[in-house]
Amino acid sequence: MPRYDDRYGNTRLYVGRLSSRTRTRDLERLFSRYGRVRDVDMKRDYAFVEFSDPRDADDARYYLDGRDFDGSRITVEASRGAPRGSRDNGSRGPPPGSGRCFNCGVDGHWARDCTAGDWKNKCYRCGERGHIERNCKNSPSPKKARQGGSYSRSPVKSRSPRRRRSPSRSRSYSRGRSYSRSRSPVRREKSVEDRSRSPKAMERSVSPKGRDQSLSPDRKVIDASPKRGSDYDGSPKENGNGRNSASPIVGGGESPVGLNGQDRSPIDDEAELSRPSPKGSESP
């Protein structure tokens, strides 16, 4: 089975990725090895070579595609479009001018099928190399494009402030928690002070010695009260009514204490009055 198909009789080849040093005569010398070359159309970095026999063209494409020539690896493919000025268009692709490539500027194929040079690094808007359409100076800037579409996004902007309030709520909540945590030790100190002021704590803090001192005056009053039927009072201390029984009277008054230092109680006086005197018994 032959490696070529001459159904369309394609004798025109596309040669791409040529070096800047390559000339027309260099291409004629290279392709003339495989057959008779009819025409060589040289461009900036690509060229079109036309053979007299389609089989010679297919042989040249088979052996020269991907070969290093003049310091560059060239690509050789069958041209899909008819050359300019050709009257016999037939059914081989679109008419001249209708299928122009944005990459190489040649009619007969599309940019996605072009293999002339580094076609991926060429701008489809201005046709220059070294940048793409997105970075082209002639293309509209993204800022203007965003401004043009801002009218349709206006409802979204009106909703955006509501969404921005949510972080502030979370911040206030976090602040409140941190504030309450910082105040918690003060509350604990207050609770300790209240416990220390409670009556139970005060009773626990009082020593047994203090209890005896606080209860000693009552016991002294009870011990100092004169007992019934006793003639003597041990010491000039307070009785049950809180009065001194042997306090001296200022102003030369007589003391109720007798000559012998005995303390006369009212009960003893009543007993003496009730007794009969010996003189009365002796009287007639």
UniProtKB/Swiss-Prot annotation:
- Provide the species name: Arabidopsis thaliana (Mouse-ear cress)
Among PANTHER family, the record links this protein to: RIBONUCLEOPROTEIN RB97D (PTHR48038:SF1)
Membrane-crossing residue ranges in chain numbering:
none
**InterPro entries cross-referenced by the UniProt entry:** Nucleotide-bd_a/b_plait_sf, RBD_domain_sf, RRM_dom, Znf_CCHC, Znf_CCHC_sf
Q: What is this protein called?
A: Serine/arginine-rich splicing factor RS2Z32
| Similarity section | Belongs to the splicing factor SR family. RS2Z subfamily.
Cite the post-translational modification comment: Extensively phosphorylated on serine residues in the RS domain.
Record PTM Phosphoserine, positions in chain:
166, 168, 184, 205, 207, 214, 216, 225, 235, 255, 265, 277, 281
In Gene Ontology terms, what is one molecular function of this protein? zinc ion binding
Query: Is Phosphoprotein one of the keywords?
Result: yes
Its localization reads: Nucleus
* Zn-finger segments (CCHC-type): 99-116, 121-138
Gene expressing this chain: RS2Z32
A single Gene Ontology CC annotation of this entry is:
spliceosomal complex
User: Locate the RRM domain: which residues?
Assistant: 11-81
Record Pfam families: RRM_1, zf-CCHC
What does this protein do, in the record's words?
Probably involved in intron recognition and spliceosome assembly.
Question: Which spans does this entry mark as compositional bias, Basic and acidic residues?
Answer: 186-203, 209-236
